[in-house]
Amino acid sequence: MVGRATRVAGLALLLLATSCTSGSVSPSPSASGRPTGATHLQLIEAEDAQTLDPALIDDPTSLAIGNEIFAGLTRLDANQRPVPGLAERWEIGDAGRTYTFHLRNAHYQSGATVQAQDALSAWTRALAPQMNSPLTIFFSPLGARYPGDSITGVQAVDSTTLRVQLPQANSELLTLLALPPYWLIDPKQPTAGAGPYHLDKWERGRALQLSAYTGYWGSSPSVRKVDIEIEPDNTKRLDRFTSGGADIAHGFGGSQLLAFARDPQRAAELHRVPNTRATWLGFNTVAGSGYGPTDRMALAQAIDRARVTDLALFGSMLAVPATDLLPPGVPGHLARQLPGYDPAAAKTALDAASFPSRLDLYFSTNATVGRVATDLQDQISTATGRTVVLHPTGDFFNQAALDKLPFFIDTWSADIPYPSDILENVIRANSQFNNLRLFDPAIESALDQGRAATTWDDALKAYQQAEMVALSQNRLIPLYSGVEPYLVRSGLRVPFVGGAIAFHWEDVR
């Protein structure tokens, strides 16, 4: 998997945080003299939104802004659990294959009333070939995957009732409905959403201005105005924040953040928010069949996760040691008891098993994972007395294509804050991205149960069981979970959620 090996290309690399794009700055007033609470929020971003069309959004800045302008049938609460959005309630029937949504009385920013038919119109629009949407795969629960595919199981029963019939049960649907391309739009004015804020002005590459929508169906936001400045230069962006010109800033490199955190007067302004990125060591069941259970446990004991994130990830500024394959930014994460660091036990076990004197380690993606690979090469070599040969990124993909990838570092960044996004891709048999070539009937059964579950709790329990089976075999060894650092001015309370969307403007106090 290359960086963003999931269904929306490029997002993981953007989340890793350093932008090199050029652009100009829109001046914004100094923050001095502003009250400690927030009625006017000033944000500074490294990159502009690429689009604010719900059918096309596939970058983090567009997602964060679009989430404030538009709304779906559901929304995600502080635990990323789907709760009522434009649908005030719903029923699930036919063993999870039929959903009936009852819409609340809500209006778009154009003044038009939200109607059930609008959902079908918005989703059909996103699937239209001329839209060239990169998000059509998200409609797979509805039986559509590609541009031009039709949706046959969605029916507007009346103006406030929408019935969705799925080809097969899929518990991911309620989470998907809170994200693009499922957001509803006014069919006559596609730029008008039903979210808490509307766009007042957009100077491309410079700034955006938004204000609270007075007709919003939810609680009235205390933040009434939001200004977003675009500053690609990391140093200038940090200067804007430290001089009081911005309330919230992010998108910085690890070295900058490390220096910032070492300033005792500034450290409290740094917040590391869990995202959806997971990184692990894996053993291919075919090419890596020579690694037995004892060998895999020994290699797990040869790794100090805290050292990995400290040395390779700038003092854990960009990640934290993993306690699970599912990162904290994805529902279902558990603080599991993973094999602990014990280099002496690792060497003893490998020596007793007459383990070979050489290991070949492959890694995917980018420079960050490359630093991790270099540190793991040193750790494993020092702990076990073996020579660890580190192969370049190109070898990873060549060997993966030939199914000859024995021992490797892999990573996944989920588009959807739901366990299936990671587990269905990483440990489901025959998945394109299952570089483990793992097949276990117990895993398959648990994944099937998670997909077919009709309640949130039952789904998470099943997915956690599937993961437990994979981890108990040490076929994969979780290394670290990603975090997205944010700088927040003192006195401002930001209830960070994490996952795909770090926080909501309307929750800032």
What do the PLM-derived regions correspond to, one by one?
Residues V154-Q155, R386-N398, I422-S490:
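Extracytoplasmic/peripheral linker and loop segments enriched in polar/acidic and small residues
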Residues T100, D118, P134-D186:
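Surface-exposed binding/hinge segments that line
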Residues V286-G329, R371-V372, E467-R475:
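Periplasmic-binding protein-like
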Residues I44-D94, T124, A192-G193:
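N-terminal lobe/hinge region of extracytoplasmic solute-binding protein
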Residues T214-A259:
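Ligand-site clamp/hinge motif
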Residues Y486-R509:
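Long beta-strand-rich cores associated with HINT superfamily self-processing modules
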Residues M317-A352, N366-R371:
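Structural transition elements
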Residues T160, L166-P221, K225-D227, T235:
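Gly/Pro-rich hinge or "lid" segments in bacterial periplasmic/extracellular proteins
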